[in-house]
Design a protein with these regions (language model features):
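Conserved beta-strand signature within the Rossmann-like core of class I S-adenosyl-L-methionine
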Residues: 67-69, 96-104
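Conserved acidic E/D residue at the C-terminus of a beta-strand in Rossmann-like folds
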Residues: 1-5
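Glycine-rich phosphate-binding "P-loop"
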Residues: 69-81
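SAM/dcSAM-binding transferase cores
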Residues: 39-40, 137-217
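Short SAM/SAH-binding signature in class I
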Residues: 45, 63-72
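A short glycine-rich, Lys/Arg-flanked "PGG" loop and its adjoining helix->strand segment in the class I
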Residues: 80-96
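Conserved Class I S-adenosyl-L-methionine
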Residues: 110-135
Length: 217
């Protein structure tokens, strides 16, 4: 699912970019740009161009993915793809043993995924990104937490992260008809936060000595 062809179009015209890839990969990129799909005797893939909220309905519910990666702009910049309604549709196509992965550590996103029945884990920060307490989120439908091993790059949410899900930051983005504008989605959430009795996010930050820079969307 992708709304904008321009990045791929630009990349295919950029010789420096193309030199980074094997000719076979370049062929796949070109086919996805011109035909929206690629297939040979070993591999096939496709891309649905347009508003993801509309295009996701094209994917049959019978198709289940082992891996779903959410790489949209942050919830504040592009809330349309982080709403409880859209994520509900996304998770319907997740294999029961599959993984949903995103760079986002947003409390709203994590709480939504948990409310949709997924187990939530945090991606351990790399050394170079130590100022951030998480590099993202892994969500799994069925996973025995007791099987987590030290060499995994994800782990249970810390107490600090769990408490983040009890603040106003965890209030979800909503888009009931999957056609709302960015501004409308954000406004509705702000209104809901205003009247919520949940702990303020500032209080949570103060308790844990956090700054806005260390809290990723």
């Amino acid at each position: 699912l992708e709304i904008d062809k321009k990045p791929l179009e630009y990349s295919l015209r950029n010789e420096s970019f193309l030199k980074l890839w094997d000719p076979k990969v370049k062929k796949i990129f070109e086919s996805l740009y011109r035909k929206d799909y690629f297939e040979d005797q070993f591999f096939k893939c496709s891309i649905l161009w347009g508003d993801a909220r509309e295009k996701i309905n094209i994917i049959p519910s019978s198709i289940k993915f082992d891996l779903i990666y959410l790489d949209g702009f942050s919830p504040q910049k592009c809330p349309q793809v982080w709403t409880i309604e859209f994520l509900s549709k996304v998770t319907e196509n997740l294999n029961p043993q599959g993984y949903l992965i995103t760079y986002s550590s947003s409390a709203a996103v994590r709480k939504t995924l948990r409310n949709l029945g997924l187990e939530i884990f945090t991606i351990k920060p790399s050394f170079k990104n130590r100022p951030f307490w998480s590099q993202g989120t892994v969500a799994i439908s069925k996973f025995d937490k007791n099987k987590l091993k030290p060499n995994f790059n994800f782990e249970k949410l810390s107490l600090m992260e769990e408490e983040h899900l009890l603040t106003k930051a965890s209030i979800p983005y909503r888009d009931q008809d999957l056609n709302s504008s960015k501004d409308d989605i954000i406004r509705r959430r702000l209104d809901e936060q205003l009247f919520s009795n949940l702990l303020s996010t500032n209080k949570w930050r103060e308790k844990w000595g956090m700054t806005k820079l260390s809290v990723k969307s």
